[in-house]
Amino acid sequence: MEVSNKRFKREIKVGAAYYPEILRNDAVIDDDLSKMKELGIKVVRMGEFAWSTIEKREGEYDLSFFRHVMDKLYEAEIDVIFCTPSPTPPKWLIDKYSETLAVKENGERKQFGARNDYCKSSPAYREKVGMISHKIARELSNHPALIAWQVNNEISPREKCFCSYCKKGFSNFLKEKYGDIGALNAAWGTNRWSLNYRDFDDVIPPKSDVWNHPSLSLEWERFHSKNNAEFINEEIKAIKEYSNLPVGTDMMPILDQNYYQTNEHTDVVMFNHYEQNSFLMYPSFWYDYLRPIKDTPFWVTETQVNWNGAHYPEFGYRTENNCYINTWLAVAKGAEVNIYWHWREHFAGQELYHGAVLSSSGRFCYNAYEIKKAVDDFHKCRKLLSNTRVKSDIAMHFSTTAYRSFNVVQPFKGLNYLELLYDRYHKAFRHYNIDLIDTQRDLTDYKTVISPFLSCVDENGLKERMIEFVKNGGTWIVGPMSDILKDNATKYTNAPYGFLEEFAGIYTKIQIPMDTDIIKAEWKDGIELSVEKSFDGYVLTGAESLAEYTSSYLKGLAVITQKKVGKGKVIVIGSVINGEDVVRLVGEKPILKASENVELVQREDYIIALEIENKQGNIDLQGTYRDILTERSYSGHITLEAFSVMVLKKE
């Protein structure tokens, strides 16, 4: 068919991952497209594992099948996100270039047969990935069904390669960072166990059966994340030689792979998530992190329709409207695309019993109608959802460096950085718009920045920017366990903190990194303050006390302090406190008063209310509001049914 380029348009799209190359049957494809239209599916992503379909033999490329499918999709008014197939090189490539397979820490090469088991440092692998990416972009870039590209799939440094390319790359990475080996030895304190290195080639990648130096483990993780990001950027560069459509790479909810670094050259942040049936606050946490990375809306490129399962169905039965609310939550929080994995269950191979929109025999899953329900809602709210953004003047730091550091050193037993931020602090702000940001994020948009467990403040120029932020009128709520480590997971030697004592007007007299119920505290007004897990007690050297310890060795010492600096103020927290107490320190009013199972999102003068725990919730309305979805008006104390949504505008 004759085709012409179609420009990408900003609008809410619901879609599915599609693998037509598995069956290669026109009758099945036609039935698929008919059912997609029935549900309101407007976009598919495909091609990510199809290398052997596109290049059966080296240098012999054939995209005719995918052009044929894309022609059908275009006729059905369904858009395409086409993916590079780099996660699954074919057998001929492995046979000829065996060095493309990653090496396990025991020295064995991985075996052909899975995905993402390939070395991102391998010159042959990078060359072949670049070649097929070029070919795909050159041949498909002008197809009218195409709206965007995805490169690779769920890249992660968790499965590390120990080949000679990666070892040399690691040595070069360390040399670039530290300059000379003496500086590395000094920074890591290698005299500790006679670990002194003579040159960078001496620095051996850490194996899991060794009690490794924390700085070594952290930098090895950092190297693989950087190497992966460079690999992704090469794919993006290949695509952009032939196309100006948006390019992204789909990532998982892990901080091992640095999101900001990986998305430096992408046009859109892409995100895959699968969670327990009752755990919708967890993706909400990640949406608040994804949204500030770029100025453009993020895309959910994979999420479950019903059950998950790499090996068997799991993650819990999806009760009525779970799929509906999961879809709505992403869009309410700022997603522009929500794609289910996947359209049709596989009839063979890995992930055989992972849920999908259709069964392998082509029948709708039991909750497929919820997709259409969400699509119909989005149509009613299309102007609101396409023309407004989620904006916040409150930010909370969620740091890749802190995540990595607390994985290799533990200031107190059982410190789970992600769990503490998610469960302890972020959850308390479910009735506020809040951004989660890494340390390189600009602070201009915010009035208040919260930095719990921000182990390293002295990176990406953050220390200097936080000082200016406060002086210019911002409120910085920092701690506990913040500014306690350098970026290589080593301590400061002149004070417990890097610069916080001097800046915040405090002196740390006592530190107890051990949980106990003996230590108590209270606010200055006498109300009890819950403290736990670790305890820093402060003497005031310019700050004022907001809360003090009332027992044990810490009695009379401050646990929360405040100091005015310029037009703003810095508040330091010396123990793990409840999220509600952090909200008290912020001092802002919520969007509305609502029960804890209700998530609220404000977008200009609209409020989206979502019940996310599958039980009845409630909201207190000040005035009369109209629900855009039902066209009904409400006021006062109202009920929100389980897994339901209201889009409210004040009358």
Roles of regions detected by a PLM:
Residues 1-43, 56, 71-72, 79, ...:
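N-terminal carbohydrate-binding accessory modules
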Residues 10-14, 40-42, 74-80, 142-147, ...:
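Short, well-ordered coil/turn segments that N-cap beta-strands
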Residues 14-24, 49-64, 111-130, 155-159, ...:
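The substrate-binding groove and active-site-proximal loops of carbohydrate-active enzymes
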Residues 16, 36, 44, 73, ...:
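Conserved, mostly hydrophobic/aromatic
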Residues 23-38, 131-135, 251-262, 319-327:
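Short, acidic/polar
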Residues 30-38, 45-108, 234-242:
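Aromatic-lined substrate-binding rim segments of carbohydrate-active enzymes
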Residues 106-268, 282-283:
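Polysaccharide-binding and catalytic clefts of secreted carbohydrate-active enzymes
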Residues 200-203, 274-651:
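Carbohydrate-binding surfaces of carbohydrate-active enzymes
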